[in-house]
Design a protein with these regions (language model features):
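Cys-dependent protein tyrosine phosphatase-like superfamily
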Residues: 2-10, 14, 26-194, 198-199, ...
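Sec-dependent signal peptide recognition
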Residues: 13-21
Length: 276
């Protein structure tokens, strides 16, 4: 009876933490942030936040970007977004299609939660009205109130093993993005896959940093420092925690070595690898 009661309390605590995470994300979006989670939200689409992560030249080509909310003055910024993607590709010496003759297909992965309904609706309305321009997906990311580095190793291993049942479910999302870039069926139209939150810093950084650790050899510190450079500040604690949970998932569940999840924020000069 005592054991079952403790298990019940533990599961109830997890549910409370998950609910608080969603509520805190809602508070941030509504107020512009607090002392615990303080992103610079919104604003128009920023060239600084548009970054090329991956390119696959098979077929008509597939590009992967991270961005902030792809809107200007409350409207979906299609032309601006594509022009920023083109310029980032040129900077990386990566080919880019002739937009006039070939056009592009956008695959928009929004990381926003339901509390950002109006921003989600901007994107949904655009793609519903312009189905030839691409497709929209919504995969809400909230991060974690708890850092895995606060836990004992035994507890951390247990929590990490259940990561695919978390709200974010990065063990499912990150490979899905990778598989979309390296599809067995090369696209017949140039395809621009991109993911974003509001500011393109915190939740976007959590996903982007996780992707770079899994597929581009970044350590936890390199992923964290790169995210901070894009954000032009430290990414939010909840997003740091989400990034670290995935770091430990790669370590315990996938056998990755030398990610150094525990020492990700120790001050030192590091070199961030060139992505492309």
């Amino acid at each position: 009876m005592g054991k079952n009661y403790k298990l019940f309390i533990k599961e109830e605590f997890k549910m409370i933490v998950a609910a608080l995470s969603i509520l805190l994300t809602s508070y941030v979006s509504a107020t512009g942030g607090g002392s615990f989670y303080n992103p610079k939200l919104g604003g128009d689409l920023s060239y600084h936040k548009v970054r090329l992560l991956e390119y696959n030249g098979a077929g008509a080509g597939t590009w992967l970007f991270r961005t902030n909310l792809p809107a200007v003055n409350g409207s979906f910024a299609y032309d601006t977004l594509v022009s920023y993607m083109q310029q980032r590709s040129i900077e990386a010496n990566v080919s880019f299609p002739n937009i006039t003759t070939q056009g592009v297909k956008l695959v928009d992965i929004s990381l926003l939660s339901v509390n950002s309904y109006s921003d989600i609706q901007i994107e949904k309305d655009f793609f519903e009205g312009n189905p030839d321009k691409g497709i929209f997906y919504n995969w809400p990311i909230v991060g974690s109130l708890v850092s895995p580095n606060w836990l004992s190793e035994a507890e951390r291993i247990k929590e990490v093993a259940a990561l695919n049942s978390s709200i974010d479910n990065l063990p499912s999302l990150i490979p899905k993005i990778r598989n979309a870039v390296l599809s067995d069926v090369p696209p017949s139209k140039p395809t621009m896959i991109f993911f974003h939150c509001e500011a393109g810093s915190d939740r976007t950084g959590q996903v982007a940093g996780s992707y770079m650790m899994q597929y581009h050899g970044y350590t936890a510190k390199q992923a964290y420092e790169w995210d901070n450079e894009v954000a032009q500040r430290q990414i939010a604690s909840m997003s740091q925690n989400g990034l670290l949970f995935y770091c430990w998932w790669l370590t315990y569940q996938q056998g990755y070595k030398n990610l150094d999840c525990m020492n990700y924020s120790i001050a030192s000069d590091i070199e961030i690898p060139i992505i492309i």
